[in-house]
């Protein structure tokens, strides 16, 4: 592994830790959030979820063409989760998923997701979501070292079927990836 890759890994982890530190400025806030959001999702889930990865897209403006020509953008895999809707109508989920990454190698990810949910139409089944996910992933090209992730989430859904997505930021020829999956609630 070359020095620039170590710098990139360190920078990524450092930025993630700073972000988490700002969100949870003190332990009481963190424990309250855990107690009110994550623990009930684990202890009393309303739904069991099936995750099916759908697409990975590398932003063409941020990559050399010869790189994107080699990348896998069909991330087949599967995931499972537990979820619930809170009293405000917001979605909370705990999940674990494994999919084929850009290099066609397995990448596991597990974490917690939250989305503020809107139902803008008269049909209450249609919903839009915007939120975040916090979790841990590991990649082949980083020797499967567990890496924390804090990423945005967005979704559009109808009833128990949701198309959910995130964007992984990055630098030139690294990151800048749109990743989306289908989530089926049972």
UniProtKB/Swiss-Prot annotation:
The entry's cellular-component GO terms read: cell outer membrane
Site entry: Role in lipopolysaccharide recognition: 67
- Signal peptide positions are 1-25
Give the main location: membrane
- Which InterPro entries does the entry link to? LipidA_acyl_PagP, OMP/PagP_b-brl
Active-site residues, record numbering mapped to chain: 58, 101-102
Kindly indicate whether the keyword S-adenosyl-L-methionine belongs to this entry. Answer: no
Q: What is the annotated localization of this protein?
A: Cell outer membrane
The answer on whether this UniProt entry bears the keyword Cell inner membrane reads no
Q: List membrane-spanning regions.
A: none
Q: Identify the Pfam families for this entry.
A: PagP (PF07017)
Q: Which EC class is the enzyme in? A: transferase
Site note Role in the phospholipid gating applies to 172
The UniProt record lists the EC number as 2.3.1.251
GO BP annotations, alphabetical order? lipid A biosynthetic process
Q: Name one GO molecular function term.
A: acyltransferase activity
Q: What keywords does the record list, in alphabetical order?
A: Acyltransferase, Cell outer membrane, Membrane, Signal, Transferase
- Which domain of life does this protein belong to? Bacteria
What is the annotated role of this protein in its UniProt record?
A: Transfers a fatty acid residue from the sn-1 position of a phospholipid to the N-linked hydroxyfatty acid chain on the proximal unit of lipid A or its precursors.
Sequence similarity = Belongs to the lipid A palmitoyltransferase family.
Q: How does it assemble?
A: Homodimer.
This protein is called what? Answer: Lipid A acyltransferase PagP
